[in-house]
Design a protein with these regions (language model features):
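Phosphate-group recognition and catalysis centered on beta-loop-alpha active-site segments
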Residues: 1-227
């Protein structure tokens, strides 16, 4: 078992992208709500898919769809959270304007200390650290290649406060090694309670899942999810 585990952080996967999911996540007493933030005009909005220019048509790797419902923006998410849960951002935009807007909003709403920000564009995380050293930044690691690259950065002297890593990449040795460096490990795409419990025993700090019943069970707030 991890030697110095703090409280477990339960994170509702992409729940900030949908008003209905956001309400459900808060009703489930999760610790944090994940939101995929993109710059859309003058707003930071929460969605995973991209948008075709000038059209309300959105696409991802496997689909395209029209969207009629107004998008959830960052301010609306923070209004809903209102201290009931923290925000876990997956930053999707690469522009400096998006970063500046994000940081300005977090400062204005006085939630810098409680917010975690992850992303696959690691240079953006470095820039955010330069602007606001108190932010909790998590390097997103989704495959073996990015894990190898991250470990080379550590060997080269780079510091990191956290990682958001695909659960399949985590083993006991890796969890212990990162924990020894003071790196907060959040495992995502966790969809089995037994796996979540194993990760926790290894010292993983956070579990990201779209299964709210699983997250409730991890905190002892409900029965195991039905399978």
């Amino acid at each position: 078992m991890g030697a110095s585990m703090g409280p477990l952080i339960t994170i509702a996967h992409r729940a900030g992208n949908s008003r209905a999911l956001l309400r459900e996540a808060l009703a489930s007493s999760v610790d944090a709500v994940e939101a995929d933030l993109r710059l859309d005009g003058s707003r930071l909005v929460a969605r995973h898919d991209r948008r075709f220019p000038l059209l309300p048509l959105y696409y991802d790797k496997w689909y395209a769809r029209w969207r009629s419902e107004p998008q959830v923006d960052l301010n609306e998410i923070l209004d809903c959270l209102d201290g009931k849960a923290s925000l876990f951002v997956d930053i999707k935009s690469t522009s400096t304007r998006a970063l500046d807007m994000l940081l300005a909003t977090l400062r204005r709403r006085r939630v810098v200390a409680g917010t975690r920000i992850s992303g696959t564009y690691w240079h953006l995380l470095r820039r955010l650290h330069e602007e606001e050293p108190g932010l909790r930044l998590h390097y997103t690691i989704g495959d073996e290649e990015s894990l190898d690259r991250f470990q080379r950065l550590l060997e080269g002297g780079e510091s990191a406060s956290g990682v958001s890593i695909h659960e399949a990449l985590v083993d006991e040795e890796l969890a212990a090694r990162f924990q020894a460096r003071g790196i907060e490990v959040v495992a995502y795409h966790v969809d089995q309670l037994a796996r979540a419990q194993q990760l926790r025993e290894w010292g993983v700090s956070g579990i990201t899942s779209g299964d709210l019943a699983l997250l409730r069970a991890l905190k002892g707030h409900g029965p195991p999810p039905a399978r």
